[in-house]
């Protein structure tokens, strides 16, 4: 019984010793004005591009490719920042071509050539909420004003 108490006591001391060390390092990246602006710009560009999905995909392919390229830049920017795995994961979900966000929407548009207004409206609301989550996470980081 004495050994167990000593072990638990040592564990408590170790945890208390580590608290100041881990408490000083941020668990999430600080605010980045560049990341915030990029997310807002991509939200606007994505929703404007989606509005055109009633028309043939081929008519808007250059615009779609530009949007995809900009989103890849956003995920690479997020990935390159220390302690930014949550935001990086949000961008990966947003871009997933098999998912239900921008990547999946663009894949479906390309496959079907055009989409119904009802589908576009529903998808836009979901995707807008996804962008708002990314923007909200960034604006809530330490250092934002």
List the predicted regions and their residue ranges:
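Bacterial N-terminal signal peptides that target proteins for export
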Residues: 1-13
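C-terminal motif of bacterial Sec signal peptides marking the signal peptidase cleavage site
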Residues: 19-23
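Generic structural signal for well-ordered, non-transmembrane alpha-helical segments
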Residues: 36, 40-47, 65-72, 96-100, ...
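Sec-exported extracytoplasmic/periplasmic mature domains
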Residues: 47-54, 69-79, 107-110, 132-143
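Acidic helix-start/capping segments at beta-turn-to-alpha-helix junctions
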Residues: 60-68, 88
């Amino acid at each position: 019984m004495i050994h167990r108490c000593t072990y638990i006591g040592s564990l408590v001391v170790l945890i208390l010793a580590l608290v100041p060390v881990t408490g000083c390092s941020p668990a999430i990246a600080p605010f980045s004005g560049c990341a915030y602006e990029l997310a807002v710009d991509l939200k606007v560009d994505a929703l404007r591009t989606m509005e055109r999905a009633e028309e043939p995909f081929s008519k808007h392919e250059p615009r779609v490719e530009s949007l995809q390229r900009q989103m890849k830049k956003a995920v690479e920017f997020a990935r390159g920042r220390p302690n930014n795995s949550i935001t990086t994961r949000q961008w990966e979900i947003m871009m997933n071509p098999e998912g239900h966000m921008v990547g999946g929407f663009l894949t479906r548009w390309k496959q079907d050539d055009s989409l119904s207004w009802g589908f576009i409206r529903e998808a836009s609301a979901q995707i807008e909420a996804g962008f708002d989550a990314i923007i909200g996470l960034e604006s809530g980081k330490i250092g934002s004003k």
